[in-house]
């Protein structure tokens, strides 16, 4: 589940950019 959290965080940052 840790990997899912990291992936979600990366996607969120990309969306912000």
From Swiss-Prot:
Report which gene this protein is encoded by: TRBJ2-6
Q: What is this protein called?
A: T cell receptor beta joining 2-6
Identify the keywords attached in UniProt to this record, alphabetized.
Adaptive immunity, Cell membrane, Immunity, Membrane, Receptor, T cell receptor
Q: What sections of the sequence does the record tag as coiled-coil?
A: none
| Subcellular locations according to the entry | Cell membrane
| Record's keyword annotation contains Membrane | yes
Q: Which GO terms describe its biological process?
A: adaptive immune response
Q: How does it assemble?
A: Alpha-beta TR is a heterodimer composed of an alpha and beta chain; disulfide-linked. The alpha-beta TR is associated with the transmembrane signaling CD3 coreceptor proteins to form the TR-CD3 (TcR or TCR). The assembly of alpha-beta TR heterodimers with CD3 occurs in the endoplasmic reticulum where a single alpha-beta TR heterodimer associates with one CD3D-CD3E heterodimer, one CD3G-CD3E heterodimer and one CD247 homodimer forming a stable octameric structure. CD3D-CD3E and CD3G-CD3E heterodimers preferentially associate with TR alpha and TR beta chains, respectively.
Write out the function statement from the record: J region of the variable domain of T cell receptor (TR) beta chain that participates in the antigen recognition. Alpha-beta T cell receptors are antigen specific receptors which are essential to the immune response and are present on the cell surface of T lymphocytes. Recognize peptide-major histocompatibility (MH) (pMH) complexes that are displayed by antigen presenting cells (APC), a prerequisite for efficient T cell adaptive immunity against pathogens.
The Gene Ontology CC terms held by the record are:
T cell receptor complex
Asked if the keyword Cell membrane belongs to this entry, the reply reads yes
Q: Which domain of life is it from?
A: Eukaryota
Tell me the organism's taxonomic lineage.
Answer: Eukaryota, Metazoa, Chordata, Craniata, Vertebrata
């Amino acid at each position: 589940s840790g990997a899912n959290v990291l992936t979600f965080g990366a996607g969120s940052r990309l969306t912000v950019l």
